[in-house]
């Protein structure tokens, strides 16, 4: 049996207080003109009014509590239903006849020599671990712990990424990719590779970036700042894509920004992979809030365009001041959150194009939703960032169909970046 919360009053007590006040009003009307009696009655009336106001306030609080309890029970029932459905959800089925291939840079690794992308054959050249000293811990992830350090001989700051025990080929893949991208625009620079002599634990040594936490930095960025840093990030993405590499984990946590120096670096290449057309990749990549629909519906022959979706989620969070923009409780709920914004008609068109059949339980969980206009996310707090060109740009990035998203190079040509391109061209010295 459900117990009612103890509130210290009943509805009848409110009625009694009201009746007492009515009696006092009557007495006031017919009382003598004696000041003493009138003051006594007024004092009694004030006491009753205070009691009534207190009871009414408690009653309103009681109603609010009941309403909150009801909402929590409803949310709990919805969550339980979602969790029950989620336990029954199987993998999506992909019918033959609708292969997907990158629109650009598809054959980079086809024409490159095998030793460019064959990371399993990499012979690692180990440096000397004693050349570096750990100063303090700055972060940790699923596969590593990260420390600020210094080079023992010249006291130069660096970042030391100590890798947790994982398959050797995963470590080799990250090293090979970092070596292939070395010197690229806004790519974090790998300085050295060392390992402990006893435990054989490997560590990667990187350039140091005086980064500020994005949760602190992003709310302070101006419209121009956002344009500038997203443009800088696109430079890094176009470079790695042009070298046949997908990052597969683009998110604010992996974008280091030294705001004083206006320097950006794309870090954490642990999930990055070489793109080969037609190859089926693991969909368990990227962080949940930044996972593209292709990952959530088990489309395995994805490509570089995955990084543009993740960038779109990051960008939407910045301009709408809503971090994360798609806030799913699990991978299935992540697809639900996307569908509530982009609509289910568009999702079904995407699934039909690539001949994907969702598990019926996932279809039931997603439900039916109409497309939500981007203007619904604009308010007085973000309207200085969510300008028309920004909204148009986010609309082009956040598309179900990965082949409809712009490439990194196409994205850089969007009108949103005109002020940045204009500033860059004015700084570039003209040839004589």
From Swiss-Prot:
Domain Protein kinase span(s) in chain numbering: 132-417
GO CC annotations, alphabetized: chloroplast
Compartments in which it is found: Plastid, Chloroplast
Tissue specificity remark: Expressed in root tips, lateral root primordia, cotyledons, leaf primordia, sepals, filaments, stigma, and anthers.
GO-annotated biological processes: cellular response to abscisic acid stimulus; chloroplast-nucleus signaling pathway; negative regulation of seed germination; regulation of growth; regulation of photoperiodism, flowering
Keyword Ligase applies: no
Role: Casein kinases are operationally defined by their preferential utilization of acidic proteins such as caseins as substrates. The alpha chain contains the catalytic site. Involved in the regulation of various developmental processes. Involved in the regulation of plant growth and flowering time. Involved in retrograde signaling in plant responses to abscisic acid (ABA) and heat stress. May act as an enhancing factor in abiotic stress signaling through modulation of the expression of some molecular players in retrograde signaling.
Name of this chain's protein: Casein kinase II subunit alpha-4, chloroplastic
């Amino acid at each position: 049996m459900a117990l009612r919360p103890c509130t210290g009053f009943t509805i009848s007590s409110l009625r009694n207080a009201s009746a007492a006040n009515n009696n006092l009003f009557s007495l006031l009307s017919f009382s003598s003109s004696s000041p003493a009696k009138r003051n006594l009655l007024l004092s009694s009336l004030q006491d009753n009014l205070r009691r009534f106001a207190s009871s009414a306030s408690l009653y309103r609080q009681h109603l609010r509590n009941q309403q909150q309890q009801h909402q929590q029970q409803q949310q709990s029932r919805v969550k339980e239903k979602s969790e029950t459905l989620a336990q029954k959800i199987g993998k999506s089925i992909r019918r033959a006849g609708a292969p997907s291939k990158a629109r650009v840079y598809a054959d980079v690794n086809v024409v490159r020599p095998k030793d460019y992308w064959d990371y399993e054959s990499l012979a690692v050249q180990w440096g000397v671990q004693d050349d570096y000293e750990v100063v303090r811990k700055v972060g940790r992830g699923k596969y590593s712990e990260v420390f600020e350090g210094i080079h023992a001989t010249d006291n130069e700051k660096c970042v030391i990424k100590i890798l947790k025990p994982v398959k050797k080929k995963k470590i080799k893949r990250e090293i090979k990719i970092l070596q292939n991208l070395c010197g690229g625009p806004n790519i974090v620079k790998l300085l050295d590779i060392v390992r402990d002599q006893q435990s054989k634990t490997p560590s990667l040594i990187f350039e140091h970036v005086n980064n500020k936490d994005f949760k602190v930095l992003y709310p302070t960025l101006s419209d121009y700042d956002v344009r500038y840093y997203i443009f800088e990030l696109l430079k890094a993405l176009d470079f790695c894509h042009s070298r046949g590499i997908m990052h597969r984990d683009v998110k604010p946590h992996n974008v280091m920004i030294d705001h004083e120096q206006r320097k950006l670096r794309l870090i954490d290449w642990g999930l990055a992979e070489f793109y080969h057309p037609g190859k089926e990749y693991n969909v368990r990549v990227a962080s949940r809030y930044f996972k593209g629909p292709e990952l959530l519906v088990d489309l395995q022959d994805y490509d570089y365009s995955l990084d543009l979706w993740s960038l779109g989620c990051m960008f939407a969070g910045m301009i709408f001041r809503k971090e994360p923009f798609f806030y799913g409780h699990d991978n299935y709920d992540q697809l639900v959150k996307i569908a509530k914004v982009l609509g289910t008609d568009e999702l079904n068109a995407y699934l039909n194009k690539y001949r994907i059949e969702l598990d019926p339980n996932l279809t039931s969980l997603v439900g039916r939703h109409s497309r939500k206009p981007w203007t619904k996310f604009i308010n007085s707090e973000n309207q200085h960032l969510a300008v028309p060109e920004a909204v148009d740009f986010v609309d082009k990035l956040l598309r179900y169909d990965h082949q409809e998203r712009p490439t990194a190079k196409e994205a850089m040509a969007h009108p949103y970046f005109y002020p940045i391109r204009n500033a860059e061209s004015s700084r570039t010295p003209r040839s004589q």
